């Protein structure tokens, strides 16, 4: 009993010694006495976030991260003492009449708030789901006397073109942002919380496992210094765009005014500015961006305001390149191909004498040599000897003999044409245009009947060595570059290939059978010529005649042994018959 009482006393002492957590206080604007100025939020040395319930209207809140230090204070602010900690406005606060003047007359104690770092904390007593979260991100602005809140929590995230910086304490969700007129933080421009005018935009991304909307700070020029007593317009707007799933917070700072600069020294604070462009959480609905859209890592970007002139310029379609498409398309077409022996790759030549490598099994085309073919010595020989040039060289030699006679004929034709043109005179421009059109139009192609095209296609399959025991996809690389391949459409090609395979299986089976019979006969001739005795073994025979061409015609080892054993059995039967005859004769 005494031990239990001691334990209870010790527990109470420890509870009394521990500092109690203070909940953040809410200051309504219509309360008496009036609250402090509605445009200041005291921020700790490192970045954080505040979470408010989604069902609650955004209240006029003033939260201080810690009690303000006694010194140093910013000079020139006699009404409301502001510490030298960096200040950042995060919420739009409706201003009551003469709230700033009343705040100057009534100093307020420092309020205790809690900054959440990178996660949902139950300390504020809010549900984890359906929340609006504010994440202060500090952009690189102009230099100032205020201390920078950058600590070890900043890390740089790099993408191939440039760097961006944000706090590693937060798990920012990925958002799609149109990249035009955007600004990234580069490596030498680490973000600082400095004095300038900023625009705060909240965006709620698509529903995810852990929704965490981001806050983007866009710098804007300062029209003038802000003083100790500021008035904000009485009609602040909290615009919620449900279609874009984004919330925008804005306060118009145009009517900022204060006492004369002779009495108070100007100080640049961070104030809210109107926002017209929210952070987009879905891909931009633009034809150009949809065509060239590439998946990007999660990036934090600063967007500038788009003018109406810029919108009109964006709507104009980009200039299309044209002119030499037909010529380049003709030159880039594949002309010939040869398979590389012992590999799935094929060497393909185009019309402009370029070479690329095609893998039909992987459906992959590569300009550079694949890793499988880099150590091949015969590849250079294949590339230097294209098959389509071999065919062209043969008729070129035949035509070289009759070139002299053709030159003479051409000279005569040119002379006769000159005489005709001199007699007829210059033609009219309309007639010249017609002649040009007539020369440009290609001659009509004569389409062969279907039966002839089918026979040509089958001949191609036979010549190219298409296997009947393979599939269409595997044998496609053998025939795809042949001009006869284009005689039929895709459906007809597959139908004829299936018919060819069915008939070809029977033919190949017969061919294999006939080849095996021929090999068997040649093997028997070898056995007879070798004068094998019934006592010789197959191992001895193979060592002696293994290099003979007739021995190699039978490819399988089992067939060789089978034929050898059959021949040995025949020899043994002959020996038995001969012995029986000799016994009968005796």
Curated annotation (Swiss-Prot):
Domain named FF: residues: 450-503, 515-570
Stretch list, region Disordered: 1-30, 281-344, 378-448
Keyword set, alphabetical order: Repeat
CDD domains, sorted: WW
GO molecular-function terms, A-Z: RNA polymerase binding; transcription coregulator activity
Chain intervals with Basic and acidic residues compositional bias: 306-317, 378-387, 411-421, 428-439
Any one cellular-component term (Gene Ontology): nucleus
Residue ranges of every copy of the WW domain listed in the record: 148-181, 339-372
Domain of life from the UniProt record: Eukaryota
Listed SUPFAM superfamilies: FF domain, WW domain
Residue intervals passing through the bilayer: none
InterPro entries in alphabetical order: FF_domain (IPR002713), FF_domain_sf (IPR036517), TCRG1-like (IPR045148), WW_dom (IPR001202), WW_dom_sf (IPR036020)
Regions of compositional bias (Basic residues) in chain numbering: 7-23
Disulfide bridge partners, by residue number: none
Protein known as: Transcription elongation regulator 1-like protein
């Amino acid at each position: 009993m005494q031990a239990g009482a001691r334990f209870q006393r010790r527990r109470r002492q420890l509870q009394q010694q521990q500092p109690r957590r203070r909940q953040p206080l809410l200051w309504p604007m219509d309360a008496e006495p009036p609250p402090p100025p509605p445009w200041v939020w005291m921020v700790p040395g490192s970045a954080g976030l505040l979470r408010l319930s989604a069902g609650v209207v955004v209240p006029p809140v003033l939260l201080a991260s810690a009690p303000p230090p006694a010194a140093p204070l910013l000079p020139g602010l006699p009404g409301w003492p502001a510490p030298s900690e960096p200040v950042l406005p995060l919420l739009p606060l409706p201003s009551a009449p003469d709230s700033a003047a009343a705040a100057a007359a009534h100093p307020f104690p420092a309020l205790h708030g809690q900054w959440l770092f990178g996660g949902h904390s139950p300390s504020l007593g809010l549900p984890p789901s359906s929340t609006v979260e504010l994440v202060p991100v500090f952009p690189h602005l102009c230099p100032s006397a205020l201390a920078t809140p950058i600590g070890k929590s900043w890390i740089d995230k790099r993408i191939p073109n440039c760097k961006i910086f944000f706090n590693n304490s937060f798990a920012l969700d990925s958002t799609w942002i149109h990249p035009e007129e955007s600004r990234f933080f580069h490596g030498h421009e680490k973000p600082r919380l400095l004095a300038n005018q900023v625009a705060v935009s909240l965006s709620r991304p698509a529903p995810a496992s852990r929704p965490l909307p981001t806050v983007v700070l866009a710098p804007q020029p300062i029209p003038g210094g802000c003083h100790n007593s500021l008035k904000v317009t009485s009609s602040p707007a909290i615009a919620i765009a449900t279609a874009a799933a984004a919330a925008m917070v804005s306060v118009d700072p145009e009517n900022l005014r204060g006492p004369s600069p002779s009495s108070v020294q100007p100080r640049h604070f961070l104030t809210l500015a109107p926002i017209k462009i929210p952070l987009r959480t879905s891909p931009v609905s633009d034809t150009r961006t949809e065509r060239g859209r590439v998946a990007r890592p999660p990036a934090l970007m600063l967007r500038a305001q788009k003018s109406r002139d810029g919108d009109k310029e964006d709507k104009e379609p980009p200039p299309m390149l044209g002119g030499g498409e037909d010529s380049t398309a003709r030159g880039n077409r594949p002309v010939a191909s040869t398979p590389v022996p012992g590999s799935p790759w094929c060497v393909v030549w185009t019309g402009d004498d370029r070479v690329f490598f095609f893998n039909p099994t992987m459906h992959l085309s590569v300009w550079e040599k694949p890793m499988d073919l880099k150590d091949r010595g015969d590849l250079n020989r294949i590339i230097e000897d294209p098959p389509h040039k071999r065919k062209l060289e043969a008729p070129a030699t035949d035509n070289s003999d009759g070139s002299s006679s053709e030159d003479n004929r051409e000279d005569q034709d040119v002379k006769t044409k000159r005489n005709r043109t001199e007699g007829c005179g210059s033609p009219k421009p309309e007639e010249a245009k017609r002649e040009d059109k007539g020369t440009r139009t290609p001659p009509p192609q004569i389409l062969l009947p279907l039966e002839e095209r089918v026979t040509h296609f089958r001949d191609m399959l036979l010549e190219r060595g298409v296997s009947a025991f393979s599939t269409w996809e595997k044998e496609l690389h053998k025939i795809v570059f042949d001009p006869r391949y284009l005689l039929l459409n895709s459906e007809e090609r597959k139908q004829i290939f299936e018919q060819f395979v069915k008939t070809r299986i029977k033919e190949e089976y017969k061919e294999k059978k006939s080849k095996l019979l021929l090999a068997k006969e040649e093997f028997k001739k070898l056995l007879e010529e070798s004068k094998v005795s019934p006592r010789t073994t197959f191992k001895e025979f193979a060592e002696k005649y293994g290099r003979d061409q007739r021995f190699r015609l039978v490819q399988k080892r089992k067939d060789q042994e089978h034929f050898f054993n059959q021949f040995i059995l025949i020899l043994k039967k002959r020996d038995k018959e001969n012995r029986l005859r000799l016994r009968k004769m005796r």
